[in-house]
Amino acid sequence: MRGKIIIVGPGGSGKDFLRKKMVERGFDYGVSFTSRPPREGEKEGIDYYYRDINFFESNKNIFLELQEFNEWKYGISKGEFSIKNLFILSPAGLKSLPKSFRDDSFVIYLNPAEDTRVKRLKERNDADDVERRLIADQKDFFEFSDYDIMITNEDF
């Protein structure tokens, strides 16, 4: 049995939906740090630990992985990764994990059709953010294949 579950997927793929369902069933989510502002309905310590950019610069040594996406920093602390069993990572974040940590993880790749993602992204972002996110995701997920299972269910 693998020790960690890692959810990976582009914007609007259902990562938070799956995370919440798994937490309801007893999984312990490792909350990431971010420098971006909270979205409507997000809560400190539940969805993210919201910190300013100076926090990331002065605390680099606490992170197991640290990535930048659309000018915002994201990272999982070593402490969270050592005691939790459910995570959301980007392909770059997954790739930056030590091999032994990746080998001990089961990666779920959420990959619904782009039109489904666009609809979901428009519900939470303005049009410019949606287009920018789609372009960034296309680059980030180009030839991504480091997963154990891929879910493409449109109703997910």
Spans of features found by a protein language model:
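Hydrophobic anchor at the beta1->P-loop junction of P-loop NTPases
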Residues: I7
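Small-molecule kinase domains that catalyze NTP-dependent phosphoryl transfer to phosphate-bearing small molecules
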Residues: N125-F156
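Walker A/P-loop
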Residues: K15-D16
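The feature captures the helix immediately C-terminal to the Walker
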Residues: R19-K20
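ATP-dependent small-molecule kinase phosphotransfer cores
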Residues: S32-A92
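Conserved phosphate-donor/acceptor-positioning beta-strand/loop module used by diverse small-molecule
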Residues: L86-S90, S100-R124
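Post-Walker A helix-loop "phosphate-sensing" segment adjacent to the P-loop in P-loop NTPases
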Residues: E24-V31
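P-loop (Walker A) phosphate-binding loop of NTP-binding proteins
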Residues: P10
